[in-house]
Structures are given as C-alpha cells and as structure tokens.
C-alpha cells in the first residue's frame, strides 16, 4: 500500500512539474505556427487522409500477388444415378447400372496468377498521383491554419501597441489633471477647466481599460489558434522591430509555381492523362495462369482413414480475356477525360495569371505599407516632442487648457494614423506571405 501511495505521489509531482514547465511559453511567430500545427486536432486528422491514400497504393500493388485459395466439397448420394449400359457389357440385353460411390469428397488448392493486365500498372500510378494530390491539399489546409495563427499573433502585437499608446495617453492626461489641480489650489485656474482636465483623465483611463481588455481577448484567441490551455502564459518574442518584419526579410521574390493551387492543377492534369491511358489499356487482353491440386476420396461413407480410397489429381492452364463490347464504353470515358484535360489546361492558365497578379499586388501593397508605417511612426515620435513642449508651457501658465486640447487633437490623429499604418503593414505582410505560398 505504501508503495502504491509513493508511486501516485511521484506521478502527481511529475505531472505538476510538467504543467509548470508548459504554463510559460516564449514564442516567436514561427514557433507559434509550428506549435499550432503540432497541437491542433484538425491538422492531426487531415494527416490520416495521407495514410488512407498510401494504403490505396499498397492495395493496387497487391493486385500482382497470386490468388491462392483452398476449397472442399463433400457429397453423399443415398441413391446413385443409373446409367444405361448397352447390350454386351453385362449381358445380352441393355441394362441400367448405378455407377460411382455414394460418398465423394474433394479437397484442393487453387492458384491464380495475373501475367499481363496493363490496368494494374496504371492503377498504381493513379494511386501515387492521388497521394501527391492529397499531400498538396493537406498543405493547403495547413497554410490556412498558418494564416490564422499568424493573424492571431500579429493581432496581439497590434493590441499591445494600442494598449501602450492608450497608457501613454492616460499618463499624459494625468499629468494635465495634476497640474490643473495644483493651479486650482493656487487660484490661477478656474474650477471648470480643472473639471475638464479631470474628466479627460477619467475618459483616458476608460480607453486604457478597453485596450487592455482587447489585448487579453487577442491573447486568448492566439491560445485557441495554437491549441494551448487558457492558463498558459504566453510571451511573444517577436515585435514590430524584429528582423522577421523587416523589409528585407519580407521582400522574398514570389513564384506562382510554388503555390499549392498550381501544383494541385498540375497533378489533376496528370490524373486526367492517366485515366485516358487506363481506359485505352482496358481494350487490351488480359492473361492469367491458373493451377489446381486436389485429392479425392470416394467410398460408401466418410471414413477418411481408408487411405486406399484417396486419389490425387491436378491441372494447370492459361486464361485469356479479350474485351469486346467494353470498348464502346471506354470510348465515352476517354472522351470525357479529354474534355476534362482541356478544361484543366484553361484553369491552370487562369490560376497562374491570377496568382501572378496577386503576388504583384501584394508586393506593392507591402512596400507602400512599409513606407506609410515608417512615416507615421516618425510623426508619432514628433508628437511626443510636441507633448513635452506643451507640457512645459502649460506648467508655466503660458498655455491654456483649451490650447492643450487643440494640440491633443493633432497628437491623437498621429497616434491613430500610426496604429492604422501598423495594422495595414501587418495585414499586407500576411497577404504577401499568402501570395508567395508561405501561408
């Protein structure tokens, strides 16, 4: 009993340590994507489609294996069928004579081996092509999940920036309110101006609280996308200044042929050609080898211990199968897949043109968003300098609170422009990664 308790305590302590080890995660964007692909159940479920298609390849290849089967037939005839015996065999007159044994048993082994059947080889090629197609579909599903995780990760960075700016605004209005309170006590400020400053500070606190709430929601969404527990503390190691978001790292030349949509259409076209080949080969004859070895027991009962009544026999042969009317059906199937092939060619050309334009457009949007973010960031930094200057003027009494509010409009506009530019940049980076086939 003590041993069992000790084992349970050890297991609990190990589990607790494991939980503690996974409750804190430092994640870059790429690490978050890798973790999500590892943890998500839909990714794991999709991988079983690959196992199914791999099994189909093995099933097609096994068509070449010989078919070996055993059979048994035990028959008892209470009354044997009579056979007419002509005159001269058993007497001067014809007679009905029952020939044979009442008990007949035959046990044998049959072997059938395909020697020539062109369709099997093509079936294996089709199965392998379908596996490659399923791999590309699985990749497309993973790219969709990568995009969701990346959007969730970048949304946290955006909400973090909004929270920081809201906190800066709150601190700024707090300083205005503190100065106004001091002036009110000195009698150099009317009460209404003080109340305005206090109200603006309270409103700024509300905005900060809302920004923090949005940040927590964004973090919860990221945890959901990478499938970790809600109690896990995530620390994002990438930020807007990280090399991962630099213009040089994002400006990767895109190629439409790298997109899985193009690869799927190419594989679909290969499948069309293989189907045409398969139906053409259906018109060719099939050749098979067969053999049998059996032992027969004949007697009046089923006493198999009487070895003298056992007798073996065997045979071998070749079987030819030549389709005749099936060729009329094959013609319709061949025509259908020729039409599908033409259709796939056109879809491939259009999809290539679509993706080429998508890459070009996403590249321009990313370049513009990068420039706009840098410009608005400079304006945002300039607004901080303006704030320091006006704070000194307000402290010295050379600037009224109404003048402070006029300046705050410009400051708030700079902040909102910067946040919007960051949002556009993050969205453009996602769209570009998607366009070149990374997501």
Predicted regions located by residue number:
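Small/polar, glycine/serine/threonine/aspartate-rich low-complexity segments that form flexible
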Residues: 20-24, 71-113, 239-246, 291-322, ...
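Sec/SRP-type N-terminal targeting helices
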Residues: 44-48, 61, 115-142, 167, ...
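Bacterial Sec-pathway N-terminal export signals of envelope proteins
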Residues: 18-69, 73, 79, 230, ...
